[in-house]
């Protein structure tokens, strides 16, 4: 408790030192504008969790319960307007710490906007991600308890395999990134084409096309699907969207969950019911075909050669999300339901279960500079479940500067999907967070 109070004192002092009002910088002439925007998060987290063994107890390399976390974004948007046509580019810089990859900050791309809508070329953020509504839209704090929890530690494993858990609402088209051997390996997602309609009577729609989710637009090695560099029909040596699981006796299952010819779309509706009441509804979805098959292979212990024993078809990507946010005066509430079905799974490996779905809800109350929220998440991934409840509060010292405190309790229950005979195990814990968000 003393350590958490010390961290709180540091965060408060830093917030007070930064409490000088600033506005978003603009540079402009008659038809060209440059907008600079950024985000910085500093957070301290304290966790207490059961069933952790040896170094699983460590939050960082040398500390068991206390850890710091930082997240940064900085972007410049350059626009030029000619005859009611806006053309521009958004350029996101790579920071020296964890990059914030939210849709509002991430995504270097070119765009053209007219009265007929907006086209984005090369954006890594798809239409469904930008138009999706979840309960977290109304919450205070960050909901970042999962950064400190370990749900697949040694206690939860069976025959060396980990159970699969989701700790927030995840969708395939925004899950993958490419490694550039830089400080941060989670900065780039697949490149795509986006189109958004203008808002008309409260409605707005968007659609995206992604040829290949392994194509980030900057891959250092496009030979992404080779069998030990000897062809294009075997096991990939890249980590982009690909997982390999050891089954014992030299056998492995390699699952390439990249997608080709992927489409995503969304539709939102906003309505002012009265002077004090507003409603926002959203429906989004994703569809695509698996890029490769699941590969069952075996490595010879002496020669180290790889023998492909069999390949299995993965199911198509089919996912959707339904969400709503209602605001009345100082009160807000949000809820969403997401279903990924059996997307990109095969019965030969996913023996315990193949379906994934999420329930997410939150209520919030704001009065002046203070906002408090209560949020709930249930995530079920292949019958492995996570339940989490978070209570958070934040205080706006000035526009853009938000110190916050948050406490979350979570429980995860499940087993590796390849072993239906494995016992289901449970781990639970509590995470306390204190931090500061700065936006400009």
From Swiss-Prot:
UniProt keyword annotations, A-Z: Signal
Origin superkingdom: Bacteria
Signal peptide positions (record): 1-19
Organism: Rickettsia prowazekii (strain Madrid E)
Coiled coil regions in record: none
Gene Ontology cellular component annotations, sorted alphabetically: membrane
Keyword Membrane applies: no
UniProt KW Iron keyword: no
A Gene Ontology molecular function term of the record: porin activity
Name of this chain's protein: Uncharacterized protein RP068
